[in-house]
Amino acid sequence: MLPTENRLRRREDFATAVRRGRRAGRPLLVVHLRSGATDPHAPGESAPPTRAGFVVSKAVGGAVVRNKVKRRLRHLMRDRVALLPPGSLVVVRALPGAGDADHAQLAQDLDAALQRLLGGGAR
């Protein structure tokens, strides 16, 4: 489970990540990343935590399928939060094919999207 301090909950935070962040699309999901704008040399300020949120619409499937996809994505992001810059906002939007995908396929798409957003992958 994703720790509480790493969860994105407010509508404004989702909107900021989607509108002002960078986007990487994959066959099963789209990842929006708004990098943290913190100054590492600012005195007395600790880095805010990276926060992640998930959007899984009814196009993915029924309630059981949507919740299964959200649980899988939360589990995958838990291990990847440390790789992102402090203070970042991440929104993972599941596409309709995510409901039929297994854990490994979701992990592969999430890793590829994050790698592209962090500058490690070619277009």
Curated annotation (Swiss-Prot):
Q: What class of enzyme is it?
A: hydrolase
Q: Which GO terms describe its cellular component?
A: ribonuclease P complex
Q: What's the Enzyme Commission number for this chain?
A: 3.1.26.5
GO terms for MF: 3'-tRNA processing endoribonuclease activity; ribonuclease P activity; tRNA binding
Question: Which of UniProt's keywords are assigned here?
Answer: Endonuclease, Hydrolase, Nuclease, RNA-binding, tRNA processing
Gene Ontology annotations of biological process type: tRNA 5'-leader removal
Which reaction(s) does its UniProt entry say it catalyses? Answer: Endonucleolytic cleavage of RNA, removing 5'-extranucleotides from tRNA precursor
Instruction: Keyword check for Nuclease, yes or no.
Output: yes
> What does the subunit comment say?
Consists of a catalytic RNA component (M1 or rnpB) and a protein subunit.
Question: What PANTHER family does the record tag this protein with?
Answer: RIBONUCLEASE P PROTEIN COMPONENT
Its biological function? RNaseP catalyzes the removal of the 5'-leader sequence from pre-tRNA to produce the mature 5'-terminus. It can also cleave other RNA substrates such as 4.5S RNA. The protein component plays an auxiliary but essential role in vivo by binding to the 5'-leader sequence and broadening the substrate specificity of the ribozyme.
The entry assigns this protein to a family as follows: Belongs to the RnpA family.
The molecule here is called Ribonuclease P protein component
Q: What species was this sequence derived from?
A: Streptomyces avermitilis (strain ATCC 31267 / DSM 46492 / JCM 5070 / NBRC 14893 / NCIMB 12804 / NRRL 8165 / MA-4680)
Q: What is the lineage of its organism?
A: Bacteria, Bacillati, Actinomycetota, Actinomycetes, Kitasatosporales
Q: Which gene encodes it?
A: rnpA
